[in-house]
UniProtKB/Swiss-Prot annotation:
SUPFAM superfamilies the record matches: EGF/Laminin
Cystines in this chain: C39-C54, C49-C70, C72-C81
Keywords: Disulfide bond, EGF-like domain, Neurotoxin, Secreted, Signal, Toxin
Superkingdom as given in the UniProt entry: Eukaryota
Protein name: OMEGA-ectatommitoxin(02)-Rm1d
Cellular component GO terms held in the UniProt record: extracellular region
The EGF-like domain, residue ranges: 43-82
Upper classification of the organism: Eukaryota, Metazoa, Ecdysozoa, Arthropoda, Hexapoda
Localization (cell): Secreted
Keyword Disulfide bond appears in the UniProt entry: yes
Amino acid sequence: MKDSYISIVIAYLMVTFILVSSMPIEGEKRELGPHRLPCPPKLNDENYCFNGKCVHLVAQDEPGKPYYSCICDEFYIGERCGTLDLTNPGYFLKGQSSTQSSI
């Protein structure tokens, strides 16, 4: 009984460590993963993503077929990052702190 309890605790700690270590640190820039490539310059020049960064996803089921996506800037959502996410409480908190500091 004691051994199974210890095994459960160890498993829980390992999962917690993995989850916490995979979370980005504030201000940290993540590298593109193995299935993401930079977008062609033409798409970046045409502002494919309104408020974000364009990435070319490599589809494993259809290699060679281009699929582009956006990694949105903070507080923006949508297919091309064109919508301000007003449901994010951080948007209002960030706005209040900048307003208060300018007074």
